[in-house]
Amino acid sequence: MTLVQVKDKEFYLDDFLKQRLDNLKDIVYKKNWDGVFIIDGLERVGKSTLGLSCAYYLSDGNFTVKNVCADGDDAIRKIESFPDKSVLLIDEGSLIFNSRDAMKKEQKKLIKILNVVGQKNMIFIIVLPSFFDLAKSIALRRSKFLLHCYTDNSLVRGRFAYFGEDAKKILYGVGKKNYDSYEYPKRSLNELGRFTDFNPLGEEYFETKRQSLHSALHEDERIKKTDLALRMILHVDKYVFPIPFNKKMRREMLGIDERTYTKYLELATTGGVLATTLS
């Protein structure tokens, strides 16, 4: 490992990882590309710590709690306001509390976010529990590499495995068929690294994570309430009436104008209400 100094802080970086991060800095800052990569691992293995270390190094120390995105909506706001070639980190650990529908909705936001990241030549770090939960377009096509965090047999934190672009493709295909296994393709000794407990943001970062988790815990509840409200407004059970009711008849019966009705239909397709509600 190499002792690096960034501004007034010193911390250790794995030699192989430092090379990969230096390559990423060159791609973004000198060649005007974007740099997206993924860090995953089970809960409490240290993936957020590794993410902060990478972000702080890549930004040359210009990384604060404002560069951390609590969720997709927060990321959209920050990407629009931050200058080109900024470093942002989104910690999606909260996804473990979300339903499958909520996760799909969040990933649709991520895809849109990554399009803007590319236009603004940003570095964007995605931290989440499992690489296999990501859509293929994010996991394979829009990310440079994966750092998978894990512990040793004694549950000691601070280890990661590196998967480059080609290795990610094999991992995604084979691993998904084997209960999300990370065993294949095998990693060389260089691609198995260590990291230290370095958190440049201190308690501020943990407060941001708590807010993200709180939002995720209440997300399903909010969706259920919205779903119920829209069902009451729009859903007409066809078996109650002797004839089927089309969309125009529903609008007229409920006294809802076409614009409002269209808005609710849009919610149905974007996750605000179940798609079956208005079928």
Language model region names:
Residues V68-I126:
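Conserved nucleotide-sensing/catalytic segment adjacent to the nucleotide-binding pocket
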Residues E221-P244, L265, T270-G272:
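Short, amphipathic alpha-helical "recognition" segments used to contact nucleic acids or chromatin
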Residues S137-R157:
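A short helix-turn-beta junction within AAA+ P-loop NTPase domains corresponding to the substrate/partner-engaging
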